[in-house]
Amino acid sequence: MPRVKRGVTARARHKKVLELAKGFRGRRKNVYRIAKQAVMKAGQYAYRDRRNRKRVFRRLWIARINAASRSHGITYSRFIAGIKKAAIDIDRKMLAELAVNDPAAFGSIVEKVKAQLA
């Protein structure tokens, strides 16, 4: 049975890891053993934060809607309750966009909500 030499496959594997570690600081970018650990940890952070991103953005939208609705004299919780009651089917992402980029449209929604709650 012939001897198997792993030079080509090892080189390819090392190259793949070192390319993923591009931009890292210190020896994490050019020492395979350290780069491999750094890439693994980066992957764990990426996996975790893809899930956290959804929470973070929802919190941001809620903060923006709350600020805009309070400037119109209504709290966030009453505003959301009024939207549900008025059967306005618009999500928090779009409400936050309106609050930031089109305050007049957001104001008209607030007026409809206030009328529904009164």
Swiss-Prot record:
Recorded hits in Gene3D superfamilies, A to Z, give: 6.10.160.10, Ribosomal protein L20
Q: Does the keyword Lipid biosynthesis apply?
A: no
Say yes or no: keyword Ribosomal protein present.
yes
Q: Which residues form a coiled coil?
A: none
Q: Which GO terms describe its cellular component?
A: ribonucleoprotein complex; ribosome
Domain of life, per lineage: Bacteria
Task: Set out the biological process GO terms recorded for this chain's protein.
Answer: ribosomal large subunit assembly; translation
Family membership: Belongs to the bacterial ribosomal protein bL20 family.
Entry function? Binds directly to 23S ribosomal RNA and is necessary for the in vitro assembly process of the 50S ribosomal subunit. It is not involved in the protein synthesizing functions of that subunit.
Report what the protein is called: Large ribosomal subunit protein bL20
Q: Which organism is it from?
A: Methylibium petroleiphilum (strain ATCC BAA-1232 / LMG 22953 / PM1)
